């Protein structure tokens, strides 16, 4: 046997590293291993990091600080399946940390994560990749990245996965994504509704809940509602409601149904299948407040469609809603009130709530919960709009007091709704008086000062409805309510400006309030508003005109027109034309100015400080200088007229300037005779008496202070004894005439005589009225001239005097300012040529009165002779 030779052991290759077993207890060491080229090391390191991250948020932060995220992102695309799986699992856990999410967005790993959703990947990878996406999708930027990288389609596919965790994570991610409109539209393209509906059958409540929430969101879109209907989605939802064991899903199921009911076809379908009745019964009989609340919300959403309201009314939804008002849960009360608000568009529902509903809503106005009070007020606002019966019902239920208390609420919506209800109530006079007795004018001031434009608008409208009588306006004025109302005229909001203008127009109904509004600057603000083509409205123009009607001096200066309803009273003055935006100086300031070259200011003032002459007859009938604005109670019978016809013009009617022209009519003959008689009467007086009268008149012209010597001095405008005499004379002589045309003609002749008589057209340039006016200004030491002092007047002097006297005896006439010193009066008269014609009376016609060339002549408006009179 041969000798055994010992085999030599070959040494290991020099380039091979001997195996090294390492046991590490530091996360930092394991993080370093993530850069290893060995797949086994990478897999074990990832597994260790996964276990470490599962232990809590602090560990996730530690891994982030150690720089583990960036090398892990590279492992998502590793060739080794185990490494890739473990890395994906880590990101599923880490992505719940906000700082990690932020870093992942910066590293743009979304494409790599979505790639893990491929069908060929393991279920575990699907689970953690979808978990990562679910965590990431909670933020908007990540949603965009998921959508842009095509993540929606694989997520929808995974809804059919056999693994419940994959379904849950995918559904959660989809729910987050569909909050964005683009994703919802894409969802319809991908036909995602059938797999989502299938998840409603899942044995896991969390999956069912996520599916319902997702359906609730996508059902906001019409196309999605159609797809739900076509896929029998409502049947699934109704089954859930009918299953008591699924009561934890009822709230979300109702939310989906609420959105679906906005679709008319869906509404019809659910009604035909009996689902609507089940829904109402479910809402009324459920003991869970949130279910009742969501049921009421479903009704509210659906009730915005008129056909849906009709169907609800047929199903007697009103009874259900009234029952829900009695719930102990505030959320249910709010939802029921909102549903009633929506159903109010149906007239039948409105009538039903008259007896049942309004009393309960009034009680809710007293709730401690501000939101409940607001919702109840909204329902009452809709119930009482254009419905006097419901407004009465609210008042009978003692609703006025809580509504006025609600005006001081902290919620703007509650204030606006309460103001609306009060406005609706105030449309009826008995209710308006009741509201006024509850101190509405004081309570509305705070809403008028609100910064909310809706509240401002509704408050101004409430003022419009409640300030319809003097007492209410006085209370508003005394409470300081006019100031915030005037400020609202400056609002940039069209609705606020319109309603504030309307309120100002109503408040300007009495002189004191109108004057206070003007003092606060309402007239100036409205003038500025009306200049703007975009800011003005019909109410601002009407309010401006209403205020001007209480300041006729300003109105005539600005507009050059006074209508027959604009009655000239003492204190009126004609300053002449002023441009828009120019401020008209007050009379006192004008009186205290020195004479100048400016146009004379004509003053109307019949008030006097002396008694009338003892020679005047019938002192008891008409007081000296008394203002008469209406002739309705002063008309004499025709018998009296004939009896007194012999003195149409009594003593003092003559003119200091002789009229040498021949009279043009019989009436002028009477005038001439009367003038001659008066002239003779004047000549019989001695020079001393004339001088004495002149001195007295001059003394009376000087502005006086009442109660001189006392500390309280009141300025008075210059008196005008001549004008006082005119008023007395026309009242005695012209007022008794029963024929309106004769009245106008006689008054025209009277005015002409007092202003220098008839003037032939060719002699008009020689009529030296300017010198006369200048002499008066010098004599009175003022630019303000009482109208009675003017003895040589032209068009605008005579037209003003005619209007002032006509207003005293009830002759309706307008005053129109023309160009170059022209002015004229217009009257409305029946055409005499139609007398005796059978049939209805024709419309009266407008005439211009001749006060210059043929005093008393009447010319049809826009006729050639009238145009020659009005225009140069």
UniProtKB/Swiss-Prot annotation:
Keywords: Autophagy, Differentiation, Lipoprotein, Palmitate, Repeat, Spermatogenesis. SUPFAM superfamilies: ARM repeat. Residues 636-646 have a biased composition (Basic residues). Residues 675-693 have a biased composition (Basic and acidic residues). Residues 610-693 are annotated as: Disordered. GO terms for biological process: flagellated sperm motility; ribophagy; spermatid development. ARM repeats lie at residues 15-54, 57-96, 98-138, 140-179, 181-220, 222-262, 264-304, 306-345, 346-385, 388-427, 429-468, 470-509. Residues 626-635 have a biased composition (Low complexity). This is Armadillo repeat-containing protein 3. Pfam families: Arm, ARM_ARMC5, EDR1_CTR1_ARMC3_pept. GO terms for cellular component: extracellular exosome. The lineage of its organism: Eukaryota, Metazoa, Chordata, Craniata, Vertebrata. A lipid is attached at residues 507, 518 (S-palmitoyl cysteine). Homodimer. Interacts with PIK3C3, PIK3R4 and BECN1. Interacts (via ARM domains) with ATG14. Essential for male fertility and sperm motility. During spermatogenesis, promotes the autophagic degradation of excessive ribosomes, providing energy resources for mitochondria and thus ensuring sperm flagellar motility. Palmitoylation is important for its function in autophagy. InterPro entries: ARM-like, ARM-type_fold, ARM_ARMC5, Armadillo, Armadillo-Ser/Thr_Kinase, EDR1/CTR1/ARMC3-like_pept-like.
């Amino acid at each position: 046997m041969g000798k055994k030779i010992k085999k030599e052991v070959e040494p290991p290759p020099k380039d091979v590293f001997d195996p090294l077993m390492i046991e590490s207890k530091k996360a930092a060491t394991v993080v370093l291993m993530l850069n290893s080229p060995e797949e086994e090391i990478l897999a074990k390191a990832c597994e260790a990091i996964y276990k470490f991250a599962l232990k809590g948020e602090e560990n996730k932060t530690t891994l982030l600080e150690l720089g583990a995220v960036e090398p892990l992102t590279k492992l998502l695309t590793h060739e080794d399946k185990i490494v890739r799986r473990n890395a994906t699992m880590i990101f599923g856990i880490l992505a719940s940390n906000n700082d990690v999410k932020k870093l992942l967005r910066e590293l743009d790993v979304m494409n790599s994560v979505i790639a893990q959703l491929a069908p060929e990947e393991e279920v575990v990878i699907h689970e953690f990749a979808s978990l990562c996406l679910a965590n990431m999708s909670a933020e908007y930027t990540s949603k965009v990245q998921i959508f842009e990288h095509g993540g929606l389609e694989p997520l929808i596919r995974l809804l059919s996965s056999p693994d419940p965790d994959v379904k849950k994570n995918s559904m959660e991610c989809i729910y987050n994504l569909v909050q964005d409109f683009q994703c919802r539209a894409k969802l319809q393209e991908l036909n995602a509704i059938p797999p989502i509906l299938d998840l409603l059958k899942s044995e896991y409540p969390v999956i069912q809940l996520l599916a319902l929430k997702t359906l609730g969101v996508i059902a906001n879109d019409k196309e999605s509602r159609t797809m739900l209907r076509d896929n029998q989605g409502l049947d699934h939802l109704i089954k859930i409601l009918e299953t008591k064991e699924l009561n934890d899903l009822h709230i979300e199921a109702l939310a989906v149904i609420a959105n679906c009911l906005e679709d008319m076809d869906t509404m019809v379908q659910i009604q035909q299948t009996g689902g609507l009745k089940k829904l109402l019964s479910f809402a009324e009989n459920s003991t869970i407040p949130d279910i009742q609340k969501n049921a009421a919300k479903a009704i509210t959403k659906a009730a915005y469609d008129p056909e849906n309201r009709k169907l609800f009314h047929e199903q007697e939804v009103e009874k259900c809603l009234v029952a829900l008002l009695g719930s102990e849960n505030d959320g249910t009360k709010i939802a029921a009130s909102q549903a009633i608000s929506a159903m109010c568009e149906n007239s039948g529902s409105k009538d039903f709530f008259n007896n049942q509903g309004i009393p309960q809503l009034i009680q809710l106005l007293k709730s401690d919960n501000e939101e409940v009070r607001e919702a109840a007020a909204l329902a009452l606002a809709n119930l009482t709009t254009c419905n006097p019966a419901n407004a009465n019902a609210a008042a009978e239920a003692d609703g006025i007091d809580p509504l006025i208390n609600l005006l001081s609420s902290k919620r703007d919506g509650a204030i606006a709704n309460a103001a609306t209800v009060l406005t609706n109530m105030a449309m009826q006079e008995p209710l308006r008086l009741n509201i006024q007795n509850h101190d509405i004018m004081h309570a509305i001031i705070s809403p008028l000062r609100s910064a909310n434009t809706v509240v401002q608008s509704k408050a101004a409208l409430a003022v419009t409805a409640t300030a319809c009588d003097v007492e209410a306006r006085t209370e508003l004025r005394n409470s300081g309510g006019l100031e915030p109302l005037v400020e609202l005229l400056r609002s940039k909001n069209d609705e606020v400006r319109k309603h504030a203008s309307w309120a100002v127009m109503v408040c300007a109904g009495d002189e004191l309030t109108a004057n206070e509004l003007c003092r606060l600057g309402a007239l100036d603000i409205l003038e500025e508003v009306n200049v703007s083509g975009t800011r003005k409205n019909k109410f601002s123009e009407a309010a401006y005109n209403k205020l001007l009607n209480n300041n006729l001096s300003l109105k005539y200066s600005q507009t050059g027109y006074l209508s027959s309803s604009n009655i000239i009273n003492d204190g009126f003055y004609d300053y002449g034309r002023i441009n828009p935006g120019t401020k008209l100086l007050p009379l006192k300031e004008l009186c205290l100015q020195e004479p100048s070259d400016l146009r004379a200011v004509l003053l109307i003032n019949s008030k006097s400080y002396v008694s009338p002459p003892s020679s005047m007859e019938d002192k008891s009938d008409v007081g000296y200088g008394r203002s008469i604005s209406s002739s309705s109670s002063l008309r004499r019978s025709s018998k009296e007229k004939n009896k007194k016809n012999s003195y149409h013009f009594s003593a003092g009617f003559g003119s200091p300037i002789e009229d040498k022209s021949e009279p043009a009519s019989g009436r002028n003959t009477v005038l001439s005779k009367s003038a001659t008689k008066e002239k003779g009467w004047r000549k019989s007086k001695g020079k001393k008496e004339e001088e004495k009268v002149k001195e007295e008149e001059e003394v009376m012209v000087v502005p006086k202070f009442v109660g001189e010597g006392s500390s309280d001095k009141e300025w008075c405008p210059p008196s005008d004894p001549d004008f006082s005499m005119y008023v007395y004379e026309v009242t005695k002589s012209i007022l008794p005439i029963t024929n309106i045309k004769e009245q106008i003609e006689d008054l025209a002749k009277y005015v002409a005589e007092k202003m220098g008589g008839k003037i032939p057209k060719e002699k008009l340039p020689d009529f030296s009225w300017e010198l006369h006016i200048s002499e008066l200004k010098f004599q009175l030491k003022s630019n303000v001239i009482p109208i009675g002092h003017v003895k040589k007047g032209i068009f605008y002097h005579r037209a003003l005097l005619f209007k002032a006297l006509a207003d005293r005896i009830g002759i309706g006439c307008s005053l129109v300012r023309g160009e170059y010193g022209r002015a004229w009066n217009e009257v409305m008269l029946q055409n005499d040529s139609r007398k005796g014609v059978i049939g209805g009376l024709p419309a009266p016609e407008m005439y211009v009165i001749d006060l210059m060339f043929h005093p008393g002549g009447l010319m049809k408006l826009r006729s050639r002779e009238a145009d020659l009179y009005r225009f140069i």
